[in-house]
């Protein structure tokens, strides 16, 4: 019997699933480029709406809530902390939920609904508790979109192409991170709240349309079973799409991480999870992987990356005001040189990770940041020459920030994939990837939370120049840990260990 029009419509909208009836646009909706673009737009929306609201928060608290000026800073900080805290708490929850569901689309849409609710509450809210709940919902949305989005990317492109994919996505979303605060302040100044939230709802509409249309490859393959003659990229697994890059990365990993005896069995034994695991480890199977120092170092790299970003976010506006008497709009312009190189060089460094491995890129990037951060001691109050010096050093910092984006995510994904390959029964069919990126999102959010606090305390107690000296020392320590653990222990250290 031919399927009814209603069945076709429900299948197309993914409301009802009948694998004997293909949804409209199956090929392009399950295409690698469309899936990755959907993830990129989701992450862009999250960061854009976060940045769009931040410059408006002080005015919202004063005009709509009536917060006195002397309590404004503490309330703004509290709303920022509510966002970060919710991301920390809900990231692992999002990972566990996603790995227990048959598809990624449902939790991906759940995150968008949380963001929609948050935006409506921010637009209409006129009390502090409502604004706090709205920021918590924004944090919940961030936890889901980053956790599910990164897991979906890995499943779509495979580990061999993950570096350049993440680099390209981060490059794209950095546009939102750069433009949103400037646009939010400008729209509020010219149009008030309707203009700010009008563009927010427009971007949410585009994001919703893409998320409802996207079809995961593993879901699309179930439709293709009834039509094996279909010509799509569905029959090409991520491993087949790596154009030899995985062979190169595998060879490098073998060179760096292979036991000195060269035994494949011994290599796999390092990733073997014993059968004697507590109940919580079977409920959350990513937990045994946390004993791996490489994975812990990958998380540390993500934490330091976020802490550096939070450091710049917290100090650039105050330095611009203290040194050069800049207002909020001109302070925002100083973020452009910092983010421009991230936008341009993100895909290149992602390609370098896929081509040369995580160790050289992470070590070089963090080592490069050491002298650049130390040189940030040079700018002082003054005229155009000092402004140009500060802007130039921020641009150089942007190069380093572009280099540290991809290695931690790619390294963590590669390690957990190895655990999954050696212990497929322990992890189940879906694997622990959403749990992995849930933890990664949690660590990153913690870094974003600590970064501004640490930067503010250090700047007040020892000065801006010495604060950057401390951050440079942290980058040097991180580079050393990357050299030892990321990509596997170097042979010379492995021999000494034996």
Per-range role (PLM):
Residues 144-157, 403-424:
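Intracellular juxtamembrane helix-capping segments at the cytosolic ends
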Residues 106-120, 360-375:
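Structural signature of the two symmetry-related core transmembrane helices
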Residues 13-31, 225-298:
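Juxtamembrane intracellular "pre-TM" segments in multi-pass secondary transporters
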Residues 102, 124-129, 158, 325, ...:
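Helix-breaking motifs and short loop linkers at transmembrane-helix boundaries and internal kinks
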Residues 78-95, 336-348:
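Central cavity-lining transmembrane alpha-helices of secondary-active solute carriers
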Residues 54, 293-336:
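Extracytoplasmic gate region of multi-pass secondary transporters
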Residues 136-173:
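Cytoplasmic helix-loop-helix junction between adjacent transmembrane helices
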Residues 89-125, 129:
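Conserved MFS/SLC helix-loop-helix module at the cytosolic interface between two early adjacent transmembrane helices
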């Amino acid at each position: 019997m031919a399927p009814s029009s209603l069945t076709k419509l429900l299948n197309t909208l993914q409301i009802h699933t009948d694998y004997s009836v293909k949804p409209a646009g199956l090929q392009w909706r399950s295409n690698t480029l469309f899936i990755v673009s959907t993830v990129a737009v989701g992450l862009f929306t999250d960061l854009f709406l976060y940045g769009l609201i931040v410059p408006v928060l002080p005015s919202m608290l004063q005009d709509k809530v009536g917060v006195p000026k002397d309590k404004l800073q503490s309330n703004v900080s509290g709303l920022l902390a509510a966002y970060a805290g919710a991301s920390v708490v809900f990231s692992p929850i999002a990972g566990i939920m996603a790995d227990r569901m048959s598809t990624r689309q449902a939790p991906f849409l759940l995150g968008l609904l949380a963001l929609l609710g948050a935006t409506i509450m921010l637009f209409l809210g006129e009390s502090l508790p409502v604004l706090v709940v709205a920021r918590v919902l924004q944090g919940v949305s961030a936890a889901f979109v980053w956790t599910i989005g990164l897991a979906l990317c890995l499943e779509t492109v495979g580990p061999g192409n993950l570096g350049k994919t993440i680099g390209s996505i981060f490059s794209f979303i950095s546009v939102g991170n750069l433009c949103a605060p400037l646009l939010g302040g400008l729209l509020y100044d010219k149009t008030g709240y309707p203009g700010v939230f009008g563009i927010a709802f427009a971007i949410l509409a585009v994001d919703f349309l893409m998320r409802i249309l996207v079809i995961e490859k593993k879901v699309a393959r179930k439709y293709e079973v009834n039509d094996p003659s279909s010509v799509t990229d569905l029959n090409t697994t991520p491993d087949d799409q790596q154009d030899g890059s995985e062979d190169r990365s595998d060879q490098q990993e073998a060179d760096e991480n292979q036991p000195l005896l060269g035994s494949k069995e011994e290599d796999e034994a390092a990733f073997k999870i014993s059968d004697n695991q507590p109940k919580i480890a079977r409920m959350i199977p990513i937990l045994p992987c946390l004993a791996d120092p490489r994975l812990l170092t990958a998380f540390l790299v993500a934490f330091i990356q976020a802490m550096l970003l939070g450091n710049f976010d917290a100090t650039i506006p105050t330095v611009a005001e203290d040194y050069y008497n800049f207002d909020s709009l001109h302070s925002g312009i100083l973020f452009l040189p910092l983010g421009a190189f991230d936008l341009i060089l993100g895909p290149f460094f992602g390609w370098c990770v896929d081509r040369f491995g995580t160790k050289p890129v992470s070590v070089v990037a963090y080592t490069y940041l050491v002298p650049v951060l130390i040189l940030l001691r040079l700018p002082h109050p003054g005229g155009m020459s000092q402004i140009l010096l500060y802007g130039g050093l921020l641009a150089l910092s942007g190069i380093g920030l572009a280099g540290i984006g991809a290695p931690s995510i790619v390294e963590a994904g590669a390690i957990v994939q190895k655990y999954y390959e050696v212990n497929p029964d322990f992890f189940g069919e879906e694997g622990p990837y959403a749990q992995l990126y849930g933890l990664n999102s949690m660590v990153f959010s913690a870094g974003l939370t600590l970064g501004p606090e640490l930067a503010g305390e250090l700047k007040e107690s020892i000065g801006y120049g010495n604060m950057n000296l401390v951050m440079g020392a942290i980058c040097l320590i991180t580079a050393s840990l990357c050299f030892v653990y990321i990509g596997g222990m170097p042979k010379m250290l492995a021999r000494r260990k034996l």
